[in-house]
């Protein structure tokens, strides 16, 4: 899809861009594949805030996505490419030969009328889902499973892709977009191709209201708070942090501090860690 620009009729319009949605072929979603979802505004079952900066936003219905792709050897036709308000990628409506309908994440290059299939015997073409052991080395993939039958968990956002680097026994090596190289069971499934809607990252929001539509509330800097509200707060005017390292509102090191558990059982599957920034070793 292309990027649509606006004339600077107001300050908010100046610089604002949005996707032109030229790839979208169907506006109304499939009713049988919808579920209602409630907005929690970052509150838990006690009503206490557990995640900051959430609330409001437009009402959405959840589209039931088939991340598992276990309907093997039954060809499906792409009936429509649709917008999904719950994710950055678009979704494709499939109609199987037996009449069953389902949604999948729309990969780059998938068009209405294309045929897709899942299973070990499927061809290596965009939109087909196969076990990793049946995918050739060097293939670009997305929607990768971490546990057999659980459904794709990795590489699902707009423009994302991973590459199959090699096969070692019952594992395969994949390189993620973060440059991390990871071992995954060869019996896990993945879908061929990269996720579509790659221009999503080029969109300029332009005004605060569009962020509020997404259910995000303002993120106030700690340096403008009082010292009883944040470790960075207080001082006369624009005061420095006054600490050796930036801290979270609860006094923990942040910005570059590794938050992954050192004893995480899946650490042994990471062959090479992702590249980190200047503060990556704090």
Curated annotation (Swiss-Prot):
GO MF: rRNA binding; structural constituent of ribosome; transferase activity
Family annotation (HAMAP family): Ribosomal_uL2_B (MF_01320_B)
Biological processes per GO annotation: cytoplasmic translation
NCBIfam families: rplB_bact
Lineage: Bacteria, Bacillati, Bacillota, Bacilli, Lactobacillales
Subunit structure comment from the entry: Part of the 50S ribosomal subunit. Forms a bridge to the 30S subunit in the 70S ribosome.
Name of the protein described by the UniProt record: Large ribosomal subunit protein uL2
Species assigned in the record: Pediococcus pentosaceus (strain ATCC 25745 / CCUG 21536 / LMG 10740 / 183-1w)
Gene Ontology annotations for the cellular component aspect, listed alphabetically: large ribosomal subunit
Bias-annotated ranges (Polar residues): 34-43
Coiled-coil parts of chain: none
Similarity-based family: Belongs to the universal ribosomal protein uL2 family.
Function: One of the primary rRNA binding proteins. Required for association of the 30S and 50S subunits to form the 70S ribosome, for tRNA binding and peptide bond formation. It has been suggested to have peptidyltransferase activity; this is somewhat controversial. Makes several contacts with the 16S rRNA in the 70S ribosome.
Disordered as annotated region, ranges: 26-55, 218-266
Pfam families the record matches: Ribosomal_L2 (PF00181), Ribosomal_L2_C (PF03947)
Composition-biased stretches (Basic residues): 254-266
């Amino acid at each position: 899809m292309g990027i649509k620009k606006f004339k600077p009729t107001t300050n908010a319009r100046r610089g604002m861009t949005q996707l032109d949605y030229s790839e979208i072929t169907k506006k109304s979603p499939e009713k049988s594949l919808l579920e209602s979802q409630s907005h929690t505004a970052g509150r838990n079952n006690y009503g206490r805030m557990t995640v900051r900066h959430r609330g409001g936003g437009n009402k959405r219905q959840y589209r039931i996505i088939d991340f598992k792709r276990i309907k093997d050897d039954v060809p499906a036709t792409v009936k429509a490419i649709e917008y999904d308000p719950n994710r950055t990628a678009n979704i494709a409506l499939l109609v199987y030969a037996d009449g069953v309908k389902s949604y999948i994440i729309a990969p780059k290059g998938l068009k209405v009328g294309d045929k897709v299939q899942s299973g070990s015997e499927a061809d290596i073409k965009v939109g087909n889902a196969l076990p990793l052991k049946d995918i050739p080395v060097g293939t670009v993939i997305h929607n990768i499973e971490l546990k057999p039958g659980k459904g794709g968990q990795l590489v699902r956002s707009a423009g994302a892709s991973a590459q199959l680097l090699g096969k070692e026994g019952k594992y395969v090596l994949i390189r993620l977009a973060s440059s991390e190289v990871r071992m995954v069971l060869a019996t896990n499934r993945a879908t061929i191709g990269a996720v579509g809607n790659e221009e999503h990252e080029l969109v300029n929001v332009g005004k605060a209201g569009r962020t509020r539509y997404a259910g995000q509330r303002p993120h106030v800097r700690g340096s403008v708070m009082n010292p009883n509200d944040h470790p960075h707060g207080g001082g006369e005017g624009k005061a420095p942090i006054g600490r050796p390292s930036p801290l979270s509102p609860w006094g923990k090191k942040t910005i570059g501090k590794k938050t992954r558990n050192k004893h995480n059982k899946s650490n042994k599957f990471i062959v090479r860690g992702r590249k980190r920034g200047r503060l990556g070793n704090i």
